[in-house]
Amino acid sequence: MATLPQVVQAVDMPVIAAGGIGSGQAIAAAECLGACGVQIGTLFLAAEECAISEAYRQQVIDAGDQDTIVTGISTGGRVRSVASPFLAELLADELKGLDPKVFLERTQGSYGRAIAGEIDQGTIQAGEVAGQVKAKSTAKAIIDRLVAEYQETVAKFQS
């Protein structure tokens, strides 16, 4: 959110806020900072309609607010994921100077493996709001909750 007002001021087009949007309050905050809309990803990993394995979904649901890490620093293709022994080892090697080509070889197909349920050698991509995901739900229920939280937040500021 720190860069959102800067982007809004710097460009002459609608701005969509993304990253860290996990509640109706965050949607209201993005709007206050000048965004005309938001993109939400991680929350919908818990949706029944999301085509991921139950193992992937459960890892996101079980994640706490400090349970994500960023890998891909050496390649310029940074990815935030739920921490795992596989990714912790990869990140440690990366910080020691792992060759980017070796990194790419070790991670080739890891996202697909996670989606298929092979989470031990998979990359369970999820944002920092993973800790706010508490249970499996429907996409409609997630949207309904976000709308209610947003409306409640806006009403507080209008009174």
Spans of features found by a protein language model:
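Conserved active-site-proximal phosphate/metal-binding subdomains
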Residues: 1-12, 16, 22-159
